């Protein structure tokens, strides 16, 4: 089979349909978000971010988004409490907007 007809067999993949299956360990979340493990531990407890796992915390894509929103808010000058509130409000608004679509 020539390569062009092999390529014709393929279809685009919508990765957003699979994001809910992603599981990240603490170190991976820290690397993506650009924060320390100590910060992530503290933020996870303070913001009550849901994780899986018993021996090691496992973060899903929603938890990663929350961490990144908190980081963004802190980078813009908010204290941790205000950053957590802003992240929660942003996610609630985003969820509301996606339900309306």
Regions found by a protein language model. Give the residues of each.
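Key DNA-contact positions within bacterial/archaeal DNA-binding proteins
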Residues: 38
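Arg/Lys-rich, alpha-helical DNA-contact motif
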Residues: 1-31, 45-50, 61-101
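Short, Lys/Arg-rich nucleic-acid/phosphate-binding segment
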Residues: 53-58
